[in-house]
């Protein structure tokens, strides 16, 4: 029953505990998603021998240059690029890496409501929240008219986009998510989000010069209680 909402599951026995528990913990760390370990009550107090203490597996960095070059080509042909970011940045703690990429490319950023906190709202390239047809009109206009949309660590779900109410061409979206790289007809599931962001920072040589709406921070109000 837990399989649809977890990334790994294990039913623990005295014989498999030393392999299954590390496997599931590694899955939780690498995928940043919930896991489920079923530990029967008659097994919980069983003593077992552990030959080596647990150490998280280090996921190797893969060569993403040829795929990042496709992103470079898309940006060079674009007139109005934008970055949509979301919750995976929070899950993988990639705020610094994302901000580095934004600062060096000067591409404006919007967040999905699901990913609030994914990007520094004090950054001059931050535009605000994009949630489809209920976003601020100037943000709607800019994002919907963009011809190169870098979707970094975000999911364009119905709840995050007001029922899929965005108006941009989905073919202009480059998916740069954990285990999901998609541009045109190229789909790869082998790259982690940290791997992708490191590749963006290393191989993208592009600077945006297009104007974009400036984020206006809500003003604080002084209320008097009577």
Model-derived features: positions:
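A broad, structure-centric signal for solvent-exposed, well-ordered loop/edge residues
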Residues: 9, 44-46, 50, 96, ...
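Well-ordered alpha-helical segments embedded in enzymatic catalytic cores
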Residues: 20, 66-70, 138, 196-199
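Short acidic-hydrophobic, aromatic-tinged amphipathic segments that line or gate anion-handling sites
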Residues: 8-16, 127-133, 176, 187-200
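Cofactor-pocket helix-loop regions in the catalytic cores of large enzyme subunits
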Residues: 15-16, 25, 29, 38-124, ...
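Short acidic-hydrophobic sequence patches enriched in Asp/Glu that either
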Residues: 1, 135-138, 192
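Glycine-rich, anion-gripping cofactor-binding loops and their flanking helix/strand elements
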Residues: 87-174
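Phosphate/pyrophosphate-binding active-site segments
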Residues: 50-51, 168-226
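Structural signature of the thiamine diphosphate
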Residues: 2-52, 74, 139-176, 206
